[in-house]
Amino acid sequence: MIQILTGTALLLVVLALFTLFSYKAPQGMKAMGALANAACASFLVEAFHFSLFGEQMGIKFLEGVGAANGSLGGVAAGILVPLALGVSPVYAVLVGLTVSGFGILPGFIAGYLVSFVIKFLEKKVPAGLDLIVIIVVAAPLTRGIAMVMDPVVKNTLLQIGQVLIQAQATSPILMGLILGGLITVVATAPLSSMALTSIIGLTGVPMGIGALAVFGSSFMNYQAHQVP
């Protein structure tokens, strides 16, 4: 019970911070939308193909498909976030490839911060030289930011996921009610529920609860956002 309450409290803190980022950070809402898209392109494919079709049904090919997508969440975020902030596609791909091997949140943070650096360099550096300067400056800067953020994420956000994963062994029904309810609420907030579950590294039963909650809330979101 204490583990569940601790994990839930930490999860609420994360939600508050990301909501604050969405509304107060420069172009925060666009960045969060790109993070959600990156999570869908990586986590959702992993949830279905790796966890469901692969591990549960034993289809090895689809398990490989899910594992491939799931391992590239950082690259997806590193590409989609700069694109959402108006960075040239070439530079967006440069940023994304540079964070290869890192998780979705380090890729997101690096992509977000370096986007402003790239846009500044594009304005200040003469045309023709901007590509070389951005390659020399932005690529190592992106990798450096991701390297700094990676242990921070592993020691904080991923620990929340581990607490929830361990808690399901003691009280799976209660944890399912809390986690499923929170993710459903998040689905209507600025932070994507898909992004949240991938950021905290849910696996196993909690990952299944997250996937089901996301799937169920998607119908509510579709109806709520239909244009009359």
Annotate each predicted stretch with a short phrase:
Residues 2-228:
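Pore-lining transmembrane helices
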